[in-house]
Amino acid sequence: TPTTQNTLSLHDALPISDSSEDERRLGEQAVFPETVDVNIRQLDPIPAPRAFLREQPLTDEMSELVLHSRQEIRDVLNGRDDRLLVIVGPCSIHDPKAAHEYAEKLAAVKRELEDRLVIVMRVYFEKPRTTIGWKGLINDPDLDGRFNIRKGMWLARKVLTDVLSLGLPAATEWLDPITPQYICDAISWGAIGARNTESQVHRELASGLSMPVGFKNSTDGSIKAAADSCFAAGFEHHFLSINLDGRVISAETKGNPDCHLVLRGSSHGPNYDAESVRQALEDLKVSKASGPSQHGLVIDAAHGNCGKDENREAEVIEEIAERLAHCEQGITGVMMESFLVGGHQKPAPLDQLVYGQS
């Protein structure tokens, strides 16, 4: 009867089981139609996040460093700490040994300048591509096209624990929405790149992340999408994700009040000049007037702000420092790319690359 049908719950109406044994048995019995996985060559299982966290746990000291540095970054962004946030390190991590050597040197600089700077090491494992190319340590750790993602994820946690053991907080770019469950416990600052700043998936992701997140302006130079993302990520969202046991779940977030804008220039030129910063802050004020928070911004000295010429990054930083010395308001941090050897090289097997060069 209609009355009986109305009393059925969704769980009653759908063949859903919480039993892993039932799932296994149903999976063995399932016959998938020809409409499924047409373009999939292979499906390789990866251990759940909890397995990686259990095998490579953070020590109490590392966890305390992550929590403390996240709060330091929040205080800088909100003007409660007058130090400058500095996010610096390789374009992306491809050689854990070289990354460790670089981290040792940066840790010494951090200790020397910690009364003036909040230094965070750039530890990027995922590379967004305009078309195709090497997509980072997690995706292809051996740079040989074998895509050993299990090894890549293990190496990512190894690099992070090495960096934290030296007393350095870590920053990374969030690209794949599953990756955070594997490494976010070790991250103090996160970025959403220019190619993903309009993505609803990444706005939702940022709303649930436990650290401050910077949204970069679009590749065409527009800051509207990034400003909208900062606003949207400050509110609660509901979306599909996985938990630490690898089960698909519906995530409900509280919203991230610590999202902010990163100016990285564009194909049309730089946007770190005083007028661009003033206009960006004004646009943020308008777009976030009724939002959860209002922060200063971060200048990325690389990409469009240096014309993709790594030798100009230092010039950008020097100009920013001079303007801050003259009390320019609104700039709360800077980003720059740096490694043991200047310049960059094309991807190749590790033994064919220049050691310590991005």
Residue ranges and their predicted role:
Residues T1-L14:
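Short, small-residue-biased leader/transition segments that mark boundaries at the very start
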Residues D18, E28-D37, R116-D283, H303-E319, ...:
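Active-site-facing alpha/beta catalytic cores
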Residues D37-N78:
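N- or domain-start disorder-to-order transition segments that initiate the globular core
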Residues R74-D82, V286-Q294:
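Glycine-rich phosphate/diphosphate-binding loops that line cofactor/substrate pockets in enzymes
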Residues G89, I299:
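Conserved, mostly hydrophobic/aromatic
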Residues C91-K97:
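Short, glycine-rich nucleotide/cofactor-binding loops
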Residues A107-A108:
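N-terminal intrinsically disordered, cationic/polar leader segments
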